[in-house]
From Swiss-Prot:
Lineage: Bacteria, Bacillati, Bacillota, Clostridia, Thermoanaerobacterales
Family label: Belongs to the HypA/HybF family.
Protein name: Hydrogenase maturation factor HypA
GO term, biological process aspect, one: protein maturation
Binding positions for Ni(2+) per the UniProt entry: H2
Function: Involved in the maturation of [NiFe] hydrogenases. Required for nickel insertion into the metal center of the hydrogenase.
Record-listed Zn(2+) binding positions: C73, C76, C89, C92
GO molecular function terms noted in the UniProt entry: nickel cation binding; zinc ion binding
Keywords, ordered alphabetically: Metal-binding, Nickel, Zinc
Source organism superkingdom: Bacteria
Organism for this UniProt entry: Caldanaerobacter subterraneus subsp. tengcongensis (strain DSM 15242 / JCM 11007 / NBRC 100824 / MB4) (Thermoanaerobacter tengcongensis)
Amino acid sequence: MHELSVTQGLVDMLVEEAEKRKVKKVTKVTVVIGELTGIESESVKFYFDILTENTVAEGAELVFKIVRAQFKCTQCGNVFERSNFTFKCPVCGGQGVLIDKRGKEFYIESIEVE
C-alpha cells in the first residue's frame, strides 16, 4: 500500500519540475524501481493515472526499468541474481549477501515533454 505515497511524491516532483520549466505537457516518464523495494509497478501505474488527472502529466506514458539485485556467495564468491525468492548461491548453495545496494532504487530516470 506504500505505492500510493511514493507515487504521490513522484507526481508532486514531476508536476513541480514541469511548472518550473513552463512545460505544457509531460508525454513520457521513465521510472527506475529496484526489485528489493517492494514497490509494485502495476500499483504505481494505477495511482499515477489517478494522481495525474488534471495535471500536465495526465495521459503520460509511464515506463519502468526494473533493477535486479546482485548477491555474492559467502562461501564460493559467486556473483548471482536471486531467483525464486531465495538468496542461496546457485553454484554451491551457500548464503548470498547483497552487493552495492543494487535493487533498492526508486527514482525518475527521464521525463519527455512537448
